[in-house]
């Protein structure tokens, strides 16, 4: 597939590397489909040679979405991947067979987070829609829930989950032009809900870092895609309905 480029994060599991392709040009809208997801074994098949050529095996082909900056998430013997068109695919890494697919019908640019405690994957797609999908022990994508984090804009970030809450950022409008937000969503009940959002000066496109600060409190660290390129945080607790944006570090000078 020489017309496309490998521009996805590598995922290593079960002695294999998994990765996908995207357009070889810098044009995001380049319709160079189909795009594919591959696997390569890392075993030393010929110990008499200092190097050897490996064969890329195609596992998934997408005619609508790319795998640009996409990273597979390991769930035991399975790996779940997504393309930018909103199709999720479960792969059994023992035989590299697809066990299930799910089309959510929304553009999906970020990556997936897995909560092992609840067996749920989380991601944001479309107009700031936070999804949670249960994954069964036999590699099937099951019950789906979602909640809209903000009514305008979008998010291409990867959420973080801790203790029944999901933390994720996005844009309220156009990226790098309009205000951004950091959202805290409760995913512990049957119906997801947004506890609150904190307005940011611009789009925050990063996976937040969660640090436990007490029995029922955490600190959420993240960056904002805007000058001066600082590090920021909010403090969240069990029953919080709001938070104050804190500046942790901002560079000065040129």
Annotate the PLM regions:
Residues 33-38, 87-89, 129-131, 180-183, ...:
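A short loop-to-beta-strand structural motif that recurs across blades of beta-propeller domains
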Residues 19-20, 81, 123, 168, ...:
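Residue position within the beta-strands of beta-propeller blades
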Residues 1, 51-63, 97-103, 142-150, ...:
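A short beta-strand motif characteristic of beta-propeller blades
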């Amino acid at each position: 597939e020489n017309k496309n480029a490998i521009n996805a994060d590598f995922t290593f599991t079960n002695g294999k590397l998994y990765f996908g392709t995207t357009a070889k040009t810098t044009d995001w809208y380049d319709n160079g489909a189909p795009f594919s997801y591959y696997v390569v074994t890392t075993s030393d098949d010929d110990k008499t040679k200092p190097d050897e050529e490996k064969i890329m095996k195609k596992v998934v082909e997408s005619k609508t979405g790319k795998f640009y900056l996409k990273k597979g998430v390991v769930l035991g013997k399975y790996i779940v991947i997504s393309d930018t068109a909103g199709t999720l695919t479960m792969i059994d890494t023992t035989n590299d067979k697809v066990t299930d697919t799910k089309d959510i019908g929304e553009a999906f640019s970020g990556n997936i987070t897995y909560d092992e405690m609840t067996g749920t994957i989380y991601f944001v797609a479309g107009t700031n829609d936070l999804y949670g999908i249960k994954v069964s022990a036999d590699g099937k994508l099951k019950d789906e829930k979602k909640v809209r984090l903000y009514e305008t804009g979008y998010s291409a970030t990867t959420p973080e989950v801790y203790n029944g809450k999901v933390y994720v950022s996005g844009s309220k409008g156009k990226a790098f032009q309009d205000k951004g937000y950091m959202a805290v969503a409760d995913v512990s009940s049957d119906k997801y809900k947004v506890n609150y959002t904190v307005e940011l000066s611009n789009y925050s496109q990063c996976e937040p870092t969660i640090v436990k600060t007490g029995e029922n409190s955490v600190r959420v660290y993240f960056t904002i895609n805007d000058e001066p390129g600082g590090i920021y945080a909010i403090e969240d607790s069990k029953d919080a309905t709001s938070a104050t944006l804190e500046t942790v570090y901002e560079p000065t000078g040129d």
